[in-house]
A protein has these predicted regions:
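Membrane-interface loop-to-helix entry segments
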Residues: 121-173, 204, 227-232, 364-373, ...
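C-terminal membrane-solvent junction of multi-pass transporters and transport-like membrane proteins
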Residues: 3-4, 315-323, 368-421
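Select transmembrane alpha-helical segments in multipass membrane proteins
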Residues: 5-17, 39, 79-92, 125-129, ...
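TM-loop-TM module centered on a large, flexible mid-protein loop between adjacent transmembrane helices
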Residues: 71-79, 111-115, 226-292, 311-363
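Helix-loop-helix junctions that connect adjacent transmembrane segments
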Residues: 3, 38-39, 117-121, 149-280
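Hydrophobic transmembrane alpha-helices that form the core helical bundles
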Residues: 31-32, 51-130, 135-138, 284-301, ...
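Membrane-interface "cap" regions at the ends of multi-pass membrane proteins
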Residues: 1-43, 49-54, 180, 387, ...
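A generic transmembrane alpha-helix motif of multi-pass inner-membrane proteins
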Residues: 41, 170, 362-370, 397-464
Length: 464
C-alpha cells in the first residue's frame, strides 16, 4: 500500500544515501591497516565506488521497484536460480550485521553511564536493540525519515569531529603512526587484506535507496542525483575520518568494534566524561539509523523475491494496515536474536574472540556474495533489453561498460576470498578465520537447500 501523504524530496534522498552507505562503525577496522589505508581508500573509490555507483544509478532508474538487486539479476537471468541466491545472500547478511552491532550496544551504554553490564544484562540490551529495529521496520520508510535524516547528520558530525580531533592531535603531538613514504604504499599482509573488504562494504547500499522509489516525488531524477551528491560527500567524509583515527591512534591500539570511541579517548586523554559519553551516545544513534535504513530495503527485497517463489513463503507476509513486509522483518529479528544467544556461548568458549568482528565479517562475506552477479547482470541487460528507456546511462560504449562492470566484480571476489579464507594455518589465524569460513559455507549450503526445496515444490505443483 503506497503512502500518499509523505514523499521524499531530494535533500531527504541524499541524506538517506549518506545514512545507508556511510557506516561509522566500519572505519576502525580499516584504520587498523595503518598508513596504507589511505592508498586503499582512494584506490577503491576510483575502481569500485565510482563504477558501482554509476551501475546502481542506471539499474535503479531503469528497473524501479522494491526488488533491488534481486530484480536486476532475476530480470537478466530469468531461467536460472541466481536471483534466488542473490535474495538469500542479501537477506541473510542483515540479521548477521544486526547481531554484530547489537553486541556493541552494551559497551556504548557502559561508556555513557560508567558501568560494566553483566553478561545477562548485556544480552537483554542486545535483544532490545534488535527488536526495536524490527518493530520500526513494520512501518513505511517515509514514516521514519526523521530517524534517517538524524542518523545521517549525526554520522557527518561524528566523522568531522574525529577528523578535526585528529588534526588537533597532530598539531600538538605529531602523527601516532609516523613513517616514511613506504608506509603509505599498499600493504599485502594477510591481516591487512582481510580488512580491505570493509572498504568495499563502506561503499555498498546505493541500491537500498532505489527500493525507496515509491516514496520519492521524482525517483528517476532523484536517484542518480542523490547517488552522485551522496557519493562525493561520503568519499570526502570517509577520508577525513580515516585521517583522524589513523593520525591519532597507534594501529596496535585500535579496537575493531569500538575504535571510534577509543580514538576520542586517546586524543582527549580520558576514558570517560561528557565528551566521550556524548560520542558514545551519537554512535549509538548511528547504529539504529544503519539498521532501520537497511532493514526496509532488505525486507522489501526479500518479500519481493518471496512473492515470486524465490524466498520462503514466510517472507511474503505483509501487514494489512500498510503493506509492509513484516514476515521478513520478524524472521530477521529471530535470526539475529539466535545469533546473539550463540554469541554468549562463543564468549564462554573463547573469551578472547571478537564477537563484533566474527559476526561482522560473516555479514561482509554474505553481502559481498550478493553483489557479484549484479555486474554481469548489468551487461546482460544492456544486450537483452536495449530498447528500455534508461533515464541515467553509464557513459561510454560496450567496451567501457565491460571494464566498469568487471573491475569492481573482480575486486569484490578478491575481497570475499581474503575475508573468508585463511592464508596461513597458525593457531591464531585459524582461530580468527575458521568461524567466518565455516559460517559462510553453512549460510551458502542452507540457501542452496532452501532453493532446491522451493524448486521441488514448484515442479510438484506444475505436475499436479
Amino acid at each position: 500500500m503506497e503512502n500518499k501523504t509523505k514523499k521524499f524530496h531530494l535533500a531527504s534522498v541524499i541524506l538517506s544515501v549518506i545514512c545507508v552507505v556511510f557506516v561509522v562503525e566500519a572505519a576502525a577496522p580499516v584504520a587498523s591497516i595503518g598508513n596504507s589505508q589511505y592508498f586503499w581508500w582512494i584506490f577503491m573509490m576510483l575502481l569500485f565506488l565510482l563504477p558501482y555507483g554509476m551501475i546502481a544509478a542506471e539499474l535503479g532508474t531503469t528497473y524501479v521497484g522494491d526488488g533491488g538487486l534481486y530484480d536486476w539479476v532475476n530480470t537478466a537471468y530469468p531461467t536460472t536460480k541466481w536471483g534466488a541466491r542473490v535474495a538469500w545472500y542479501y537477506w541473510i547478511n542483515f540479521p548477521l550485521w544486526m547481531a554484530s552491532l547489537a553486541v556493541i550496544c552494551p559497551r556504548l551504554l557502559g561508556t555513557m553511564f560508567g558501568w560494566n553490564p553483566s553478561p545477562f544484562v548485556s544480552l537483554l540490551i542486545e535483544l532490545a536493540f534488535i527488536w526495536i529495529v524490527t518493530i520500526v521496520a513494520f512501518f513505511p520508510v517515509c514514516d521514519s525519515i526523521w530517524i534517517l535524516n538524524l542518523s545521517a547528520a549525526v554520522k557527518v558530525v561524528l566523522a568531522l569531529a574525529v577528523g578535526g580531533l585528529g588534526v588537533w592531535y597532530v598539531t600538538r603531538h605529531g602523527f601516532a603512526n609516523a613513517g616514511g613514504f613506504v608506509t603509505y604504499l599498499p600493504s599485502f599482509r594477510p591481516a591487512s587484506l582481510s580488512y580491505i573488504s570493509v572498504i568495499i562494504f563502506n561503499f555498498l547500499g546505493f541500491e537500498v535507496v532505489c527500493t525507496y522509489a515509491d516514496n520519492m516525488t521524482k525517483p528517476k531524477r532523484q536517484i542518480p542525483q542523490a547517488i552522485v551528491a551522496g557519493g562525493i560527500a561520503i568519499a570526502v567524509i570517509y577520508l577525513f575520518s580515516a585521517f583522524g583515527i589513523g593520525a591519532a591512534v597507534p594501529t596496535d591500539r585500535i579496537n575493531t568494534d569500538t575504535g571510534l570511541i577509543d580514538a576520542v579517548s586517546l586524543i582527549t586523554g580520558r576514558t570517560g566524561g561528557f565528551l566521550v559519553g556524548l560520542v558514545a551516545f551519537l554512535f549509538l544513534i548511528t547504529l539504529f539509523g544503519n539498521m532501520i535504513s537497511w532493514s526496509m530495503g532488505v525486507n522489501s527485497t526479500a518479500a519481493y523475491a518471496a512473492d515470486r517463489g524465490d524466498m520462503p513463503r514466510a517472507f511474503s507476509l505483509r501487514w494489512e494496515k500498510n503493506g509492509m513486509p513484516i514476515g521478513a522483518a520478524l524472521t530477521s529479528g529471530i535470526v539475529a536474536s539466535v545469533v546473539c544467544l550463540a554469541g554468549v556461548l562463543m564468549e564462554v568458549l573463547a573469551p578472547e574472540s571478537s564477537l563484533f568482528w566474527s559476526f561482522f565479517a560473516l555479514n561482509l562475506v554474505m553481502l559481498l556474495l550478493s553483489y557479484i552477479p549484479v555486474f554481469p547482470a548489468f551487461l546482460r541487460l544492456r544486450k537483452t533489453d536495449p530498447e528500455r528507456e534508461r533515464p541515467f546511462r553509464v557513459p561510454g560504449g560496450q567496451k567501457t561498460a565491460a571494464w566498469i562492470a568487471y573491475v569492481p566484480m573482480v575486486l569484490t571476489i578478491l575481497s570475499v576470498f581474503f575475508t573468508a579464507i585463511p592464508l596461513s594455518f597458525d593457531r591464531e589465524t585459524l582461530a580468527s578465520f575458521l568461524p567466518i569460513t565455516i559460517g559462510s559455507i553453512l549460510a551458502v549450503v542452507i540457501g542452496e537447500i532452501l532453493i532446491r526445496l522451493r524448486a521441488g515444490r514448484a515442479s510438484a505443483k506444475e505436475t499436479d
